[in-house]
Amino acid sequence: MPRAPRCRAVRALLRASYRQVLPLAAFVRRLRPQGHRLVRRGDPAAFRALVAQCLVCVPWDAQPPPAAPSFRQVSCLKELVARVVQRLCERGARNVLAFGFTLLAGARGGPPVAFTTSVRSYLPNTVTDTLRGSGAWGLLLHRVGDDVLTHLLSRCALYLLVPPTCAYQVCGPPLYDLRAAAAAARRPTRQVGGTRAGFGLPRPASSNGGHGEAEGLLEARAQGARRRRSSARGRLPPAKRPRRGLEPGRDLEGQVARSPPRVVTPTRDAAEAKSRKGDVPGPCRLFPGGERGVGSASWRLSPSEGEPGAGACAETKRFLYCSGGGEQLRRSFLLCSLPPSLAGARTLVETIFLDSKPGPPGAPRRPRRLPARYWQMRPLFRKLLGNHARSPYGALLRAHCPLPASAPRAGPDHQKCPGVGGCPSERPAAAPEGEANSGRLVQLLRQHSSPWQVYGLLRACLRRLVPAGLWGSRHNERRFLRNVKKLLSLGKHGRLSQQELTWKMKVQDCAWLRASPGARCVPAAEHRQREAVLGRFLHWLMGAYVVELLRSFFYVTETTFQKNRLFFFRKRIWSQLQRLGVRQHLDRVRLRELSEAEVRQHQEARPALLTSRLRFVPKPGGLRPIVNVGCVEGAPAPPRDKKVQHLSSRVKTLFAVLNYERARRPGLLGASVLGMDDIHRAWRAFVLPLRARGPAPPLYFVKVDVVGAYDALPQDKLAEVIANVLQPQENTYCVRHCAMVRTARGRMRKSFKRHVSTFSDFQPYLRQLVEHLQAMGSLRDAVVIEQSCSLNEPGSSLFNLFLHLVRSHVIRIGGRSYIQCQGIPQGSILSTLLCSFCYGDMENKLFPGVQQDGVLLRLVDDFLLVTPHLTRARDFLRTLVRGVPEYGCQVNLRKTVVNFPVEPGALGGAAPLQLPAHCLFPWCGLLLDTRTLEVHGDHSSYARTSIRASLTFTQGFKPGRNMRRKLLAVLQLKCHGLFLDLQVNSLQTVFTNVYKIFLLQAYRFHACVLQLPFSQPVRSSPAFFLQVIADTASRGYALLKARNAGASLGARGAAGLFPSEAAQWLCLHAFLLKLARHRVTYSRLLGALRTARARLHRQLPGPTRAALEAAADPALTADFKTILD
């Protein structure tokens, strides 16, 4: 029998997801009688390969195999497979074998599939078709019989390995639906950058991959628990409370508190008990629910619907982009709908603590007995409701976030409505109608409220709302207000966890949490119950009340110039900004307003129409319109509506087909580059032959930016270009929907892709497709699951869908609907590709020979021409500056840059920015040396911005581990081959690029440290942070070697072009430059870093030291001095 492929990553992934993973022969050996051989002499090679490559995976909830299987074949293979498919469809089970099959729906379903009575096929399933027509599977049925093969197909999951590294699923629940076992997260991960322990920095004394002890210290502070070592084996002493920290013998990946529910079996319990000696038994929870003495399970503590998960108390995305509604609380808000009485207080208590949803006013309610703990809370919460009814929210808003005297008067939408929380009208001066110039916009943009003003408003509202008895002490009140301040300082993707909210809150100060009066010894279970009740109250206060205040009084948004930092505009200010922005947008883009009859017609249209909503993002000189695509006209719930899902699926199919044509005929895109990889390939292909020909001639650079590229594309011309791409009357496509599952950093990662082909290159069998993708280098260490396969996707149908999307695009602005008559929506996944196709067609027609001896690149709408011919450079510039109306191309002269003189009057009086002949030429975040053609990174975009606002990492239960992961993931993105390629760049340039990458990484490191929860000081676990710095250097050097594969960079004794010691020195020097500015924070790190740098300095040869010191010249990093962190 042939040897089974290793496929180690795939086998590890399957072992983490199933109870048992066995080779097919081993599984059958357990069931077969003595002397029964599965593989015999003379068997076909296909059958031997099937047995060697097939893995049997037993799910955790699988039924046991037949007790005494007969090993007798009764049915043919097609009949058995059909019978299994019918049973799966009748059970409604999700099984890869039954994908594409469903039960007949009356007489309209057509004839049933052969050997079935009520199953029809609505999509091809190539895996099932291959199985039931395979001679090898037929021989397997003959050897094992009906009982065993039926059990394998219906109760187990079968995978076929495809060498060298992949596999595909044959049957069983799809792998992407399974949740990996808790052991998968605890599986140790390989250290980055090889097995090096760092560069002489002290390592934590831990067995968890080098940084477990520090992580444990970070965890211990988060939990308020002390960690003790009871023996050399690291066992934990008995604890009263469930521990939530890192357990001895576990990797940093172990997230016990979030391990999924699992089916407990004796086999699994024994295996886990054997592998985790010394662990605290059972999963630990933060706030174990359940009220002792309450007889009904309906009163259990559980997260209420619509709230964030247990790990997130408040997320900034919940109060972003909330326009309209006036500066008042919604009438439907819970506090506004309840009277300040004991009955209202009871409803409030039930909603906050017992997951009860208040019904509509006046609706009869069935009274339920309230537990004693919650019954005695009613007077306090009645007082809270009374405080809310008496709170002058309008006066508080005016006092803490005042409007300037010149602010415009609010329109009718902002008049105070009857009810609690309204904001009375103020008396700002009215703005003249029709004033929409940029000066007015800039004036309004400066009138945002600072986070400190917003915090003052929230603090005043909370102090008026919450009675002192609910806080219990001033300490608890100050802790909560500190978290409110932190919520306002988070970025666009920030979140505040439940653990941060309850940290350092004193439960014993809150007398209202007690189930009965009296001071006596509090059992551990009772204390945990009080923690849970207090946590629910704080969760509601922050996640409902504070968030509602922000949603009601402010429009919160990010900007284009401050990354993810949030800005707070009062609703009255933003309404004026939005009106000016809409007026400018209507002047710039051709929109036709729809009548009410046309709106109803579009809502009932088939196929469904995409509807976009327009919002604006502030930029330095005005507002940038952003179109959010994804809604369907008339759909009640966009994410779940079937019309939305169907249309979204069709759009993704069109996107996959356009990408297929782009890859098959790259000339259609002209000079388009779709990312850094494309830029690297094109620039390398231009630079290396040019240098090989001898001394490079003077080169002329032209950078041109197009104004409003997406909004200016003529729809008729775009339709002509896409018709040439799709050739709808000729092409028919085959689209295969596949899921790819792999492991990355110890976690299961899944992606869903569409593989497009035509009949000329179609791979009929999934095995062939997996082999093809591996040969192309686009698939590795993954399991492929085929979801569906469409063999007849007409090009005409896809072209009609494209016309439908472009010419029937509805935009909602305010309460009105418009049809876009020119351009395409920017928020669609198709936008970039459509723009690239259109401009590619323009380049092929207008500039067919411009790339001779030069290169033309275009990233969407940013052109770059490099040519040794001055005449061609001037002709190219002149053509684009005059504009190309046929393609809607109009140049923004303020962003046009050249490095040669432009004759006066040659461009009609306009003059672009002229740089010296030899300079660092800027283009799309790059700095190109106009003489040597070397590439540097352009970091000017970081000027006067906060790294902390732009870098967000999910802190969770393991903030240190997540910080390290985030930093290394960002480092991998920034270490691109374009900057590290030693064939394109000189060694000195690579030294400089590496140093700047490490210096920016040091800024990110500091930003992450500032974001660590629970006020974690660096001095508490310096070994962990030193290891993060060591990992940064080793990962950076590993990426450098990967970007220069085949080159010899270093040797023993710090010899070679770029030894690892040089990368370590650059990393240490960059971190010391940044961390030394914060001596108090990093006092425990600076000494070790300086010692390690000095040791490396002695090891490096003199020429290398001189080159490194030149790369670290402070003059080269002047841009970093303006970063705000």
Swiss-Prot record:
Chain span(s) of sequence motif Bipartite nuclear localization signal: 226-244
Region of interest: CTE: 929-1125
Renumbered residue ranges of the record's region QFP motif: 364-514
TFLY (motif): residue ranges: 316-321
Chain positions recorded as Mg(2+) binding sites: 705, 861-862
Annotated region (RNA-interacting domain 1), positions in chain: 1-234
Alphabetical keyword list: Chromosome, Cytoplasm, DNA-binding, Magnesium, Metal-binding, Nucleotidyltransferase, Nucleus, Phosphoprotein, Ribonucleoprotein, RNA-directed DNA polymerase, Telomere, Transferase, Ubl conjugation
Bias-annotated ranges (Basic residues): 224-243
Annotated site (Required for optimal binding of telomeric ssDNA and incorporation of nucleotides at the second position of the template): 169
Domain of life: Eukaryota
Phosphoserine modified-residue sites: 231, 450
PROSITE patterns given in the database record: RT_POL
Enzyme Commission number(s) from the entry: 2.7.7.49
Domain (Reverse transcriptase): residue spans on this chain: 598-928
Full protein name: Telomerase reverse transcriptase
Organism: Bos taurus (Bovine)
Lineage, highest ranks first: Eukaryota, Metazoa, Chordata, Craniata, Vertebrata
